[in-house]
Each structure stands twice: as C-alpha cells, then as structure tokens.
C-alpha cells in the first residue's frame, strides 16, 4: 500500500515514524522544504534516542529512515492508496486539502483525516468520494500511544472502514470503531476535564501542581490535566472546546476565559515552551 501523510508537525511526524517503524513506505508532504527538514530532523532525533537507550540497533534506525520519502508537491501524491491529513485543526483548511486531493488522486484512494474533533461528514462533503473519507485519529505521542479512533462519516463505506481498521492493527495500534460525534470518544470526555481543571486553577482552589498531583494520585491518571493540556497544546484544547460548544450548544462546553487568554498570548504549552508550566528550564 502506498501511503502519504500531509503535515509535518508533531502529529504528522509521529504518524510517519509509526508507519515507517512497522515497515511501511510513507511519503511526508509539507508546504516547505524547511518544514520537511525540521520534521525529518525530529524523526532522526527520536530514533537516535531509542538507539541510545538500547531499544533499537543503529541498523534498525537506518532501515526505518529508508522507508521515509518527502515532497512539497501535491502531484507526487496522485497514485497513493491512502493519504492521512494531519494539518491544522481548521475545517476550511481541511476541506480545501480534501477537495484538492479528490481532484488529483486516483478514484480508489482513501482520504483519512487525523482531526481530533471535526465532522468527517463535512470534510467529506468537499469531495466526490465521501464513501472513501474517514477519520483516523491518533494520539500524542503517536509512536507510544496504542489507540486509534477510526471514525466513519455518514457516507463512509464498510470497505473503507475495514481497510483502515485492519491497517491500524498492522502498525501495532488498537483501533476502536467510533460513529461520528463531536470530539468522538476520548476528547469528548478528556477535553472538558482539562477545561474544568483550568477553571479550578483560575478560581484559586489549588495550585497547578496540586491539581495535577491530586488527579494523578486520586484518579490514578499518569499525568495531571494541566500538564496534559500543555502536552496536547492549549490551542488544540480551546479549538476542541469550541467545536463541542458549537455542535451541542450546551454551556457545559464553554471554554474557560483563562484558556482563551493563554492561547491569545501564545502560551500554548510544550510547543511554545510556556503554558501552565515553563519548559524553558
């Protein structure tokens, strides 16, 4: 199967690493060569860490990297069997990408999106192949997290679903069958919890460290909600909260003002080195 990933950010890089590590040839598509170089450097760094820790041999790293190619040109994707879009969480941008891919790619190409909350059906509406559009939602950090939410839109075919579901197993992931709903399963539960933690912190109920420690020890979570928000990206948390509120119209999904203020200040978490915690230290 010929595979491509669109997007060279944290998720795109992780998806590429995961497929290549399992022996799949995968093409990384990004807008600029600079973005590709940055992504490949990150991939090399991550693989080097695994070699240093003794988990892989140097030859294994070289073999994995040999499975990765790259391009800045959409034309190079026209013969792909499956394309996974992992670009910014913006409906208009995703629809533009899918419209272009639909016009460019062969008829049987499956178009998957790594969206964390947006409607698969609406994304598919920008194409003439809604039966071949599907959600394939990975979790960060992709190489470590076992789950993939496989989300069918209203018109996604069983053949498309089965193909992606089985492919997910082939890369050592555990796929779950999810019907389309805002936030799907994990983020519909998780993101409002993070938003609630933001509110508790803003109200002065406890410090950020105490909130995170309380959830780790009291709820057996491996990471506290504020630290997790920093890992996910507070801009992503805000975007998902806004989707949930827009789709359901329920005030329980209202993003906390502090969350919005931090995003406006570009305090997004690990990706900007500052969020609820300072990562410059």
Swiss-Prot record:
Record-annotated site: Important for catalytic activity: 137
A Gene Ontology molecular function term of the record: 3-hydroxybutyryl-CoA dehydrogenase activity
UniProt cross-references to Gene3D superfamilies, sorted A to Z: N-(1-d-carboxylethyl)-l-norvaline Dehydrogenase, domain 2 (1.10.1040.10), NAD(P)-binding Rossmann-like Domain (3.40.50.720)
EC number: 1.1.1.157
Name listed for the protein in its UniProt record: 3-hydroxybutyryl-CoA dehydrogenase
Sequence similarity: Belongs to the 3-hydroxyacyl-CoA dehydrogenase family.
Signal peptide residues on this chain, from the entry's feature table: none
PROSITE patterns: 3HCDH
Listed pathway(s): Lipid metabolism; butanoate metabolism
Native source organism of the sequence: Clostridioides difficile (Peptoclostridium difficile)
Keyword set, alphabetical order: Fatty acid metabolism, Lipid metabolism, NADP, Oxidoreductase
Keyword Lipid biosynthesis: no
Classification via InterPro entries: 3-OHacyl-CoA_DH, 3-OHacyl-CoA_DH_CS, 3-OHacyl-CoA_DH_NAD-bd, 3HC_DH_C, 6-PGluconate_DH-like_C_sf, 6PGD_dom2, NAD(P)-bd_dom_sf
One family name in Pfam for this protein: 3HCDH_N
């Amino acid at each position: 199967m010929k595979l491509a990933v669109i997007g060279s950010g944290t998720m795109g890089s992780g998806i590429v690493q995961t497929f290549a590590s399992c022996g799949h040839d995968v093409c990384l598509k990004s807008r600029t060569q600079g973005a590709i170089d940055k992504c490949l450097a990150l991939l090399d760094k991550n693989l080097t860490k695994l070699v240093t820790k003794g988990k892989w041999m140097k030859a294994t790293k070289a073999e994995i990297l040999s499975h990765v190619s790259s391009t800045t040109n959409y034309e190079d994707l026209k013969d792909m069997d499956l394309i996974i879009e992992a670009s910014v969480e913006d409906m208009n941008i995703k629809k533009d990408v899918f419209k272009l891919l639909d016009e460019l790619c062969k008829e049987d190409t499956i178009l998957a999106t790594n969206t964390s909350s947006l409607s698969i059906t609406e994304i598919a509406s920008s194409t003439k192949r809604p039966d071949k559009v599907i959600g394939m939602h990975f979790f960060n950090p992709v190489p470590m997290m076992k789950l993939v939410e496989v989300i069918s839109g209203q018109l996604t075919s069983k053949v498309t679903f089965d193909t992606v579901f089985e492919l997910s197993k082939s890369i050592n992931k555990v796929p779950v069958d999810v019907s389309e709903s805002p936030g799907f399963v994990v983020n519909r539960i998780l993101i409002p919890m993070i938003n609630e933690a933001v509110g508790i912190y803003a109200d002065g109920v406890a410090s950020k460290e105490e909130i995170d420690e309380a959830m780790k020890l009291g709820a057996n979570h491996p990471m506290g909600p504020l630290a997790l928000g920093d890992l996910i990206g507070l801009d992503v948390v805000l975007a998902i909260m806004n989707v949930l509120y827009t789709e359901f119209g329920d005030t329980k999904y209202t993003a906390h003002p502090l969350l919005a203020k931090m995003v406006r200040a570009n305090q997004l978490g690990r990706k900007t080195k500052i969020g609820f915690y300072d990562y410059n230290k």
